[in-house]
Regions:
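Generic structural marker for isolated residues within well-ordered, non-membrane alpha-helices
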Residues: 51, 87, 104
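Phosphate/pyrophosphate-binding loops at sites that engage ATP/ADP/AMP, CoA/4′-phosphopantetheine
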Residues: 51-67, 151
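DPxDG-like acidic metal-binding loop motif
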Residues: 67-97
Length: 203
C-alpha cells in the first residue's frame, strides 16, 4: 500500500486485451508504468509478460497493489477473455478491489465533444457507441460498416483500446463514485445472437 502524507493512495493495475495486450500501473491518478504488446493474436503468450513488465517498471510487486481494473469489451472472445481472466485471478488471489470498464467508454474518455466510437469487431463488423458531451447515448452494439452514418457535429473515433485508457477512465469514474463493479465480459455476439445488419446513426 502506497502512503503519501500519511494518507492511503491506490496502486492500480489496469489490464486490457481487447485489441493488443497491455498493462499499466497507476499511483493515485499518476501513470507510473506501462507495457504494451501489439500482436493481435498473442494475448495468451503476452499477458503474463505485460503484467510483469509493468510491475517491474513501477518498482512494485503485485502484493503492493490495491486495485485491479480490467477492460471488459466489447471485443472478440478469444483475446478479451485472456486479460479478463488474468485480472480476475490476480484480484481474487490477492484480495484486491476489482473494477470493470467498457472499452468504448475508455476510448471516448480520452476525446472531447460529440463522438461516435467504433472498434474492429472482426467478421467484417464494428463495435459501436455514440457519446454526447462525454455521456454515452447509444450502444454498445455490433453493426455493419455500411450502416454507420456519422451525424453532423460528431467526430468519428476509430481505434483500439489499451490499459492506459482503461486505467485513466477508471480513476476518473471512481473519483465520481461511478459503479464499476460489473466485471462480466461484453462480447455482444454468441452462437444464438445475430448482429444487426446495419445501424443508422442519426443526430
Amino acid at each position: 500500500l502506497w502512503v503519501r502524507g500519511g494518507k492511503e493512495s491506490t496502486l492500480l493495475l489496469a489490464i486490457d486485451s481487447s485489441s493488443g495486450t497491455s498493462a499499466a500501473v497507476f499511483r493515485g491518478s499518476e501513470l507510473v508504468s506501462r507495457a504494451d504488446f501489439e500482436d493481435p493474436f498473442g494475448h495468451a503468450e503476452n499477458i503474463g509478460q505485460a503484467i510483469s513488465d509493468a510491475l517491474v517498471a513501477a518498482g512494485i510487486t503485485a502484493s503492493e497493489l490495491t486495485d485491479v481494473v480490467i477492460g471488459r469489451g466489447p471485443a472478440p472472445y478469444t483475446g478479451l477473455r485472456v486479460g479478463m481472466a488474468a485480472g480476475v485471478s490476480l484480484a481474487r488471489t490477492l484480495k484486491l478491489r476489482l473494477h470493470g470498464v467498457m472499452v468504448l467508454d475508455a476510448i471516448a474518455h480520452s476525446e472531447t465533444g460529440n463522438i461516435v466510437v467504433t472498434t474492429d469487431a472482426k467478421r467484417g463488423e464494428l463495435f459501436f457507441a455514440k457519446y454526447v458531451s462525454g455521456e454515452r447515448v447509444e450502444g454498445p452494439e455490433v453493426i455493419a460498416p455500411e450502416g454507420l452514418l456519422i451525424p453532423e457535429g460528431f467526430t468519428h473515433v476509430s481505434r483500439g483500446c489499451d490499459a492506459v485508457m482503461v486505467g485513466e477512465y477508471a480513476i476518473a469514474a471512481l473519483a465520481k463514485a461511478t459503479d464499476l463493479s460489473d466485471v462480466s465480459a461484453l462480447y455482444l455476439r454468441s452462437a444464438d445472437v445475430s448482429p444487426s445488419k446495419g445501424k443508422r446513426v442519426t443526430g
